[in-house]
Each structure stands twice: as C-alpha cells, then as structure tokens.
Swiss-Prot record:
Gene name per UniProt: rps8
UniProt-listed Pfam families: Ribosomal_S8
Database matches in HAMAP family: Ribosomal_uS8_B
Upper taxonomic lineage: Eukaryota, Viridiplantae, Streptophyta, Embryophyta, Tracheophyta
One cellular component (GO) term of this entry: chloroplast
Protein name: Small ribosomal subunit protein uS8c
Subunit structure, interactors included: Part of the 30S ribosomal subunit.
Role description: One of the primary rRNA binding proteins, it binds directly to 16S rRNA central domain where it helps coordinate assembly of the platform of the 30S subunit.
Source organism of this protein record: Atropa belladonna (Belladonna)
Amino acid sequence: MGRDTIAEIITSIRNADMDRKRVVRIASTNITENIVQILLREGFIENVRKHQENNKYFLVLTLRHRRNKKRPYRNILNLKRISRPGLRIYSNYQRIPRILGGMGIVILSTSRGIMTDREARLEGIGGEILCYIW
C-alpha cells in the first residue's frame, strides 16, 4: 500500500498551525517541493529550507502566524485534500472552482506541472485537483 505524500504534508502543516508551532518538517519529494514553492509564492508560509539528515532530505517550513494577542487565535491555513488515491477528481480549466471568490487557491496537477488555479486558467489547461487552501 502506497503512501499519500500530499495528504501527509497537508496534515503536517495543518496540525502544526493548529498547535501554533512555528516550524514544521516534512519529507522532500518533487511533488512536495512544488507544492511548498506555491505556498511560499502565495504567502501562506514565510520560509523554506532544505535539510539533509542520514542521506534523507527534508523541507523545513516556517509558518506564518498572527501576532495579535488580544483576539483569540485563528488558524491562518485551512487546507483540504480533494483528489486522493482512491478517488481522483479532474477538472477542465473552465470548471476549476474558485475558493472564497478568488481569495483562496486551488492547487492542480497538470500536464505542465503543479500550478495554481489562476495559472491554469491563464494557460487554458485543466488537471487533477490536489487541494484547496484558504
């Protein structure tokens, strides 16, 4: 039985954010590196470092948190896995959903690599919907 690395990184980031951890470490693969670069570019995380330990590579992510102590803590990241190994979800570029009216992003796996919903609409290609982030 294979591992779902996308679900693992989504769960790790979500759990670290709920526990108010500043740093989270995830396994480094080509897919996880592409997803993390999208998160960094869109401003959902602050920093990424590649770390090697015992000939295995890890990505060390620095999460973005609110520093306002007056209001109750609110999670910055809401991540939801959509397509999974048992049920793949595909969409053409016209039917890619908009999250919160364009405030969130959809991460897609396309024939031209992993990209956001905005990039896929501009290029006019669809693909497998990996996750929603808002």
